[in-house]
């Protein structure tokens, strides 16, 4: 009876937390749209967006340029930040469970290095319209290489996955640096530099279609996998004892994470540390049960990228910085904190 009451109370607290986070996310959407090099009244932003979404609100006297900035430029950009942040956070949550390692994130498999190589080749060859396709193909190629190397001894393990990702990451980055050193001009180097640091600039409504479909589908699927994630976090032997076919789920999850990350990277470049930070923040809020952790981490990821993008737009007047700079400034100290915490646990 007591356990039922305790469980019911935890469920109520979890639902309350979700409502609060979703409320913060909704407010953040309007605030983020109103902030930028051209400040827009929050009330105008609110009315323009809701009016365009079909709500019977009067916009009032608003210039055409303000309408264009809000609806055609900033709102799609903020929505893409939400989608990318949610997707990267989902990938991080899944990877940390799949390899049972709290410092794993989507890029641990060398996916970012593969995307960088593909994008670099496209830029150097003058195929700038194919940067996204090149990044996607490079990310998929890197993932295939990781899976092949990890399975070379006949049995893929979490350790072999991590080691293979490290090797592929180093190899692909070396190829990228070689290509840049040999064939890049000043314009190409600047394009590559900005792309590899991530940016949501220039987002249009058309850019939202594919990421929305992929991230939405992945969220629905991964939300049903919490029992498998919880078993994996107990270790390989415990998961096998519970009847979990680890090899099947390793291939399935790694492939899905690779495709999801490749789509996101191809859309906005490389935005690091999102998948590392947000699952840990979620654990601090709701514990390690993936039934609660996964949706909370997803919302936190969306919030993180939205506000990192806002900083990239406003910190320098009339200029814009790559969003990856701000995620790295937060993520690098956080990574050190996690590693330091693990070392203290080992000593004790």
Per-region residue spans from a language model:
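Alpha-helical transmembrane segments in inner-membrane proteins
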Residues: 1-348
């Amino acid at each position: 009876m007591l356990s039922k009451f305790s469980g019911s109370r935890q469920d109520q607290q979890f639902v309350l937390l979700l409502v609060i986070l979703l409320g913060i996310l909704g407010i953040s959407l309007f605030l983020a749209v109103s902030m930028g090099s051209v400040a827009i009244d929050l009330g105008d932003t609110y009315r323009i967006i809701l009016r365009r979404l079909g709500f019977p609100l009067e916009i009032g006297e608003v210039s055409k340029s303000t309408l264009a900035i809000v609806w055609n430029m900033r709102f799609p950009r903020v929505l893409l930040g939400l989608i990318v942040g949610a997707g990267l956070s989902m990938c991080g949550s899944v990877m940390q469970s799949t390899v049972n390692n709290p410092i794993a994130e989507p890029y641990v498999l060398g996916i970012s290095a593969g995307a960088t190589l593909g994008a670099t080749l496209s830029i150097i060859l003058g195929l700038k319209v194919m940067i996204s396709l090149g990044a996607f193909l490079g990310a998929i190629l890197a993932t295939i290489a990781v899976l092949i190397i990890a399975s070379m001894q006949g049995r893929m393990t979490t350790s072999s996955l991590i080691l293979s990702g490290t090797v592929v990451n180093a190899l692909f980055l070396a190829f990228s640096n070689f290509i840049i050193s040999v064939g890049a001009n000043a314009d190409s180097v600047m394009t590559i530099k900005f792309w590899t640091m991530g940016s949501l600039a220039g987002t249009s409504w058309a850019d939202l279609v594919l990421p929305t479909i992929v991230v939405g589908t992945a969220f629905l699927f991964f939300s049903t996998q919490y029992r498998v994630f919880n078993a994996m976090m107990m270790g390989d032997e415990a998961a096998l004892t519970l009847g979990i076919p680890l090899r099947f789920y390793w291939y399935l999850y790694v492939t899905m994470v690779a495709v999801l990350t490749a789509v996101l990277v191809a859309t906005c470049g490389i935005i690091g540390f999102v998948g590392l930070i947000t699952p840990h923040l979620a654990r601090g809020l709701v514990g390690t049960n993936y039934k609660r952790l996964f949706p909370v981490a997803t919302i936190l990821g969306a919030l993180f990228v939205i506000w990192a993008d806002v900083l990239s737009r406003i910190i320098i007047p009339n200029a814009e910085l790559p969003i990856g700079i701000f995620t790295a400034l937060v993520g690098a100290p956080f990574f050190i904190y996690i590693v330091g915490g693990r070392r203290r646990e080992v000593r004790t």
